[in-house]
Amino acid sequence: MTNLPEHQSSPTEQSSAEVKKIPTMIEGFDDISHGGLPQGRTTLVSGTSGTGKTLFAVQFLYNGITIFNEPGIFVTFEESPQDIIKNALSFGWNLQSLIDQGKLFILDASPDPDGQEVAGDFDLSALIERIQYAIRKYKATRVSIDSVTAVFQQYDAASVVRREIFRLAFRLKQLGVTTIMTTERVDEYGPVARFGVEEFVSDNVVILRNVLEGERRRRTVEILKLRGTTHMKGEYPFTINNGINIFPLGAMRLTQRSSNVRVSSGVKTLDEMCGGGFFKDSIILATGATGTGKTLLVSKFLETGCQQGERALLFAYEESRAQLSRNASSWGIDFEELERRGLLRIICAYPESAGLEDHLQIIKSEIADFKPSRVAIDSLSALARGVSNNAFRQFVIGVTGFAKQEEITGFFTNTTDQFMGSNSITESHISTITDTILLLQYVEIRGEMSRAINVFKMRGSWHDKGIREYVITEKGAEIRDSFRNFEGIISGTPTRISVDEKTELARIAKGMQDLESE
């Protein structure tokens, strides 16, 4: 009987016990798979061209070697070993070093470049023996085969090829190694694989997709099945930068602590309207038409944090660094000085420069590196351009969830299309994700255009219900009294209401008495 590593069990032992899993250490995958891939079994990784199948297979082996010291075998039917080694270097993975150490072996089964015809019946016996010999020689516990589709494309007898691939999968299972087989599919949402590959590798199936949504491509991963064990259902977005990074939004737990500590918005009157300021770990959304003063509120919020010795991080998707600094300077805020002191970091990028998942990865990386107490995004609506509502909502959940996990106060802006009035807070229904909503809008009073601000929502706290006048001066934001004697301001049709003069005079007199008593 083949000697197996101590941490593995034989196939017969596995069948009578709970299915064990080995972690892949691919970021996010072990969360959605509830621990990794079933040990000693073959997993089919299927996807169209360019979805990241080969990368998944290489990363599975690389992490096994570098993290768990588990040797691996990579069988290639498509690319040459030299190309695989070269491509891996772009992710910082030195496969040649692992090969030299005897921890990785790349078995070259790629087609003959001279294109010689194969005579006789198709038979993988020699290849199976080579793989088996390599597994025993290197004491490998992980095997990646990329890709079985290439075998079908080289030979016409699909039924014979299926039989031989089944023999290979069965032999690998006998050896107790955990295997990944990659295969091509024609459509993103069509059959699992070409040539009926899923028929013989049906225990575990993972599907990678690269779908065009709107104007951008979006990568997702779905675990179709892991036989005999649990996993999370549905598609989860991922990016490719330093390897595959999956965002397991459904695995996020609402277990973060809630703070009663208040932080200042930078505008005294707004703090009073919010019952003493924002909660430390809350998410604030300022929403309104363009020019209503959302960026000003963000700037004051960040400046106040920096003045208290806190670090602040601003992600700007509509204005350049120079423009932000110039505008802030007109309000008496020196962003450049705050950056020189290391208290503020500004990241500017066009929304179209990357996909939503890439932006999310950048945001998380910058937060992890800079460790700010306050984070602002100006604006979310810019990132929503050209993507589906579902993808955008998942992005916002990812950002807010990470901010709460790190106990960071987040301040986001959203630009509405409607110039006057408001039918909804946001078009993408993200208002339920936030803790505090500041509604900013234009109102026409006596033939003049004014701005209005209202604390529309604030979880866990009393807040002012009034609709107040919001003025932008050279000193910044100034919030004045409510629009008295007017109704219909939020709907965009303010109407003056009649006032009982006697009652109004009594109210004014009482106000004067209160001031004198103070």
Curated annotation (Swiss-Prot):
- Any idea which residues bear Phosphoserine here? 431
Q: Which cofactor does it need?
A: Mg(2+)
- GO BP terms: circadian rhythm; protein autophosphorylation; regulation of circadian rhythm; regulation of DNA-templated transcription
Q: How is its activity regulated?
A: The interaction with KaiA enhances its phosphorylation status, while the interaction with KaiB decreases it.
> Which InterPro entries does this UniProt record tie to the protein?
Circadian_clock_KaiC-rel (IPR051347), Circadian_KaiC_bact (IPR013503), KaiC (IPR030665), KaiC-like_dom (IPR014774), KaiC_C (IPR047222), KaiC_dom (IPR010624), KaiC_N (IPR047221), P-loop_NTPase (IPR027417)
Phosphothreonine occurs at: 432
Detail which positions bind ATP 1: 49-55, 90, 225-227, 229, 231
The domain of life is Bacteria
Q: Where is the active site?
A: 78 (proton acceptor in ci (kaic 1)), 318 (proton acceptor in cii (kaic 2))
Q: Does the keyword Hydrolase apply?
A: yes
**Catalytic activity reported:** L-seryl-[protein] + ATP = O-phospho-L-seryl-[protein] + ADP + H(+); L-threonyl-[protein] + ATP = O-phospho-L-threonyl-[protein] + ADP + H(+); ATP + H2O = ADP + phosphate + H(+)
Q: Name one GO molecular function term.
A: DNA binding
Which residue stretches, if any, does this entry annotate as coiled coil? none
Explain how, and how many, cofactor molecules are bound.
Binds 2 Mg(2+) ions per subunit, one in each domain. Mg(2+) is required for hexamerization and phosphatase activity.
- Key words of the record: ATP-binding, Biological rhythms, Hydrolase, Kinase, Magnesium, Metal-binding, Nucleotide-binding, Phosphoprotein, Repeat, Serine/threonine-protein kinase, Transcription, Transcription regulation, Transferase
Which residues are involved in binding ATP 2?
290-296, 331, 451, 457-459, 461, 463, 465
Chain residue ranges for the region called Linker: 248-260
Q: What is its EC number?
A: 2.7.11.1, 3.6.4.-
Entry PTM: Phosphorylated on serine/threonine residues by autocatalysis. Both phosphorylated and unphosphorylated forms exist. Both autophosphorylates and autodephosphorylates. Phosphorylated form correlates with clock speed.
Binding of Mg(2+) 1, residues: 54
The cross-references to NCBIfam families, in alphabetical order and at most eight, read: circ_KaiC, PRK09302.1
Q: Please state what the annotation says regarding this protein's domains.
A: In the homohexamer the 2 domains (called CI and CII) self-associate to each form a 'donut' layer. The KaiC CI domain mediates interaction with KaiB, CikA and SasA. ATP hydrolysis by the CI domain causes a conformational change that allows KaiB binding. The 2 domains communicate to control ATPase activity. In the homohexamer the 2 domains (called CI and CII) self-associate to each form a 'donut' layer; the compactness and local conformation of the domains varies over the cell cycle and impacts function. CII has the autokinase and autophosphatase activities, both CI and CII have (weak) ATPase activity; CI has the clock pacemaker role.
Task: State the similarity comment.
Answer: Belongs to the KaiC family.
**UniProt-recorded name of the protein:** Circadian clock oscillator protein KaiC
| Species the sequence originates in | Thermosynechococcus vestitus (strain NIES-2133 / IAM M-273 / BP-1)
